[in-house]
A protein has these predicted regions:
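Peri-catalytic and regulatory segments of divalent metal-dependent proteins
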Residues: 3-157, 226-233, 240, 246-255, ...
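Hydrophobic alpha-helical membrane-anchor/signal-helix detector
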Residues: 153-174
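Metalloprotease/metallohydrolase-associated module, dominated by Zn2+-dependent proteases
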Residues: 167-236
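Conserved positions within tetratricopeptide repeat
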Residues: 221, 238-241, 265
Length: 292
């Protein structure tokens, strides 16, 4: 989260979002990079195009009677003033969850009926859930996730080629030494290097199947917390995470690196205890971009 968002005078919700989004250097860099339209960029755009779309005008799971409430919520949050192609819907489901779905023109934020009807839910907690999902959509987390995967895959292919080359080199040297000097070599130094590269390839490939990264989840949490903090209700997002509880974690069991509710609460508690913390990385990138 850009430090500029924290300095917006309360309460000006649309100005908060403008400051948070316009000063996000990593997102700005991605938008610039994706325009290169080379191998990794084309792969990311192709995968985004292949994702299923959500059609609010046709989807029968949407609770139509709650649409006015959803539209008002976006107005109260200042999101409706931003001019982004996004919408909010309550959808029928037995799962307590909130999610962001891509639409033809932008994205839709959805909250399930199971979650919306949970004990303890307040208007501000719903705002927190929406802010979290809005961050995923507005910061282009889907596309950035695909782009990171595409670049990582190319890195792995390069490392795989290096590993294969080292294998061939080690075998060639061993054969050469044995033939020329009658001294077989073990190739231990090469083996160690090859083993490290091979291990890196396996781990990084397994961890980068499509899903929000831990960093993206924490970033979306921070956006939600900072937004509610801006309106004087920061603790409510943490309460919202508590309401999600372990049942929410169970939905993401297949993602071994998806942060648990407990770890997300701990992260925000740390943020609460250290208000002096700033986004040094974002500030550094901004300085680099704006320097002549």
């Amino acid at each position: 989260m850009a430090d500029e968002a924290k300095s917006v005078t309360p309460i000006n919700t649309s100005a908060f979002w403008v400051a948070a989004l316009d000063n996000n250097e990593l997102c700005a860099k991605f938008i610039k990079d994706i325009q290169k339209n080379k191998g990794a960029e084309k792969e990311a755009l192709r995968k985004i195009a292949q994702l299923p779309r959500f059609y609010p005008q046709y989807d029968e799971t949407i609770v139509e009677s709650m649409q006015g409430f959803c539209d008002t919520l976006l107005i109260d949050m200042g999101i409706a003033d931003l001019g982004l192609k996004c919408s909010l819907h309550i959808v029928y489901s037995d799962e307590a969850n909130a999610f962001t779905a891509l639409t033809e023109e932008g994205f839709a934020m959805c909250i399930t009926t199971k979650l919306a009807l949970k004990n303890g839910i307040t208007y501000e907690i719903l705002m927190g859930y929406v802010a979290h999902e809005f961050a995923h959509g507005a910061l282009l987390h889907h596309a950035r996730g695909f782009y990171a995967q595409a670049k990582e895959r190319r890195k792995n292919e390069l490392l795989g080629g290096i590993a294969a080359g080292l294998n061939a080199l080690a075998a060639g040297m061993e054969a050469y030494n044995a033939a020329a000097y009658g001294i077989p070599t073990s190739g231990k130094d090469y083996d160690a290097t090859i083993a490290n590269i091979g291990n890196d390839i396996k781990i990084s490939t397994l961890k980068h199947s499509f899903k929000y990264s831990r960093e993206q989840e924490f970033e979306a949490d921070l956006f939600a917390y900072r937004f509610l903090e801006h309106i004087g209700k920061g603790e409510e997002f943490i309460n919202g995470l508590r309401i999600l509880g372990t049942a929410y974690d169970a939905l993401y069991d297949e993602y071994s690196d998806h942060p648990t509710i407990g770890s997300r609460i701990d992260f925000l508690k740390y943020v609460q205890l250290h208000p002096e913390l700033g986004n040094k990385k974002n500030a550094k990138l901004k300085k680099k971009r704006t320097q002549p």
